[in-house]
A protein has these predicted regions:
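N-terminal type II signal-anchor transmembrane helix
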Residues: 21-69
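Short low-complexity stretches enriched in small and charged residues
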Residues: 26-29, 37-44, 69, 74, ...
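N-terminal Lys/Arg-rich, disordered targeting/topogenic segments
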Residues: 1-32
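Short, flexible segments with low predicted structural confidence
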Residues: 54-56, 125-126, 284-285, 315-316
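Short N-terminal micro-motifs specific to bacterial/archaeal maturation
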Residues: 28-31, 71-74, 90, 119, ...
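Signal peptide-directed extracytoplasmic domains
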Residues: 55-211
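Bacterial extracytoplasmic/cell-wall-associated proteins, especially those involved in peptidoglycan
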Residues: 79, 155-164, 171-363
């Protein structure tokens, strides 16, 4: 091999050298741009995500759109999406999607409680969420007045908004007269009518146990049921608190002496046990014999004639000590009492003169 050939061989790179040099050649321009674009896209997505999160948090904490309290009823079994849409439709929150997503992220979606809520004005979606988690539902009131008949009380229970179900007897419940405690009862939307009826019945039983245990000695009746019967008569005879014990004392005296009670409300109940009698009693009514006519029959009638309140129960268990045997209306909402029939007749005559004067306008 000539010197020229050796020189050419030295100056010509080998295949191995060419491969090594080609492997260190700079990457094509297009690949670098792809990497940069991907990195820019990731940065953009992160920025957008953070922006959306910041907006969502701001929206979740912002004041609500309502300008006054809003009442909403959330049904049992409703999912978070349905609840969120209902709140948005009612004007409680601005966006249902923000509320639904926030409750899911905070893992409180399944903690939202059904019921009736009164959401304050302009509260944030976050505040609404916590109200629903705590179950701060509306507490309703149902007032059963003393002196109502059981049928009237049942009508009020059936008409009470938010209560559910029927009022069939059974399961320990009684629809008998005088077995319910007339008070103001609290309940929440969705409570059953049977439950509130049971509470009234249990309240009456507990009250009677307590009051009966503290009763005065030597009363002319032997059972709690008899006490309720007499208390119901007192309840219907007078609405004045300071008269109850006095009226009870008169009836206790008459029972001890074997006299007829001669109570108009008992006669009226016998004529119309399912609703108040819608007319005045006549002389014929007083002479019509039935189990509740205490003008015709001695002793207590067979059942209460109304729902007696606690005060009337206490009055018959602690009657006023008196010699009075009679009373009649005095024209002012109260009564005038007498020990003798002669005195009573004079009081009745005064009452009738007053009635005539009122009827004729004083002429």
């Amino acid at each position: 091999m000539s010197d020229d050939d050796n020189l050419a061989k030295k100056l010509t790179p080998s295949a191995k050298t060419r491969r090594r040099r080609s492997s260190t050649r700079p990457e094509p321009l297009s690949r670098r741009w792809i990497v940069r674009l991907v990195m820019l896209l990731i940065a953009f997505l992160i920025t957008v995500t953070l922006g959306v999160l910041a907006w969502g948090v701001s929206e979740f904490n912002a004041r609500g759109p309502s300008t006054e309290p809003v009442t909403v009823v959330l049904e049992k079994g409703a999912g978070v999406n349905a609840i969120a849409r209902q709140l948005e439709t009612a004007g409680v929150i601005r966006r249902a999607d923000v509320f639904a997503i926030a409750t899911r992220i905070s893992k409180t979606a399944k903690k939202l409680k059904a019921g009736e809520y009164q959401i304050p004005a302009a509260v944030s979606a976050r505040a609404v969420m916590h109200i629903l988690i705590r179950g701060e539902t509306v507490v309703r009131k149902l007032t059963i007045a003393e002196g109502l008949q059981t049928a009237q009380a049942l009508e009020l229970i059936m008409a009470a908004e938010g209560l559910q179900g029927d009022l069939d007897a059974g399961g320990g419940l009684s629809l008998a007269e005088g077995r319910l405690l007339p008070e103001t009862w609290h309940y929440k939307w969705g409570d059953s009518r049977r439950d509130i009826l049971r509470r009234m019945q249990e309240g009456h039983a507990q009250m009677m146990e307590k009051e009966w245990a503290a009763r005065a000695p030597d009363l002319p009746f032997q059972t709690k049921d008899e006490a309720v019967v007499l208390a119901s008569i007192v309840e219907k005879e007078t609405g004045k608190a300071d008269e109850r014990a006095h009226v009870a004392g008169v009836f206790v005296n008459r029972l001890r002496l074997g006299m007829r009670l001669q109570s108009d409300p008992t006669v009226a109940f016998g004529l119309s046990p399912d609703a108040p009698l819608d007319r005045l009693l006549s002389r014929t009514d007083l002479r019509t014999d039935h189990a509740w006519n205490t003008y015709m029959r001695k002793g207590l009638p067979p059942s209460p004639i109304a729902l007696p309140g606690r005060a009337s129960i206490q009055a018959v268990l602690h009657p006023l000590t008196t010699k009075d045997l009679y009373f009649v209306a005095d024209g002012t909402g109260g009564h005038v009492f007498a020990q003798t029939l002669a005195g009573h007749n004079r009081n009745v005559a005064k009452w009738r003169r007053l009635q005539r004067a009122l009827t004729t306008g004083g002429d």
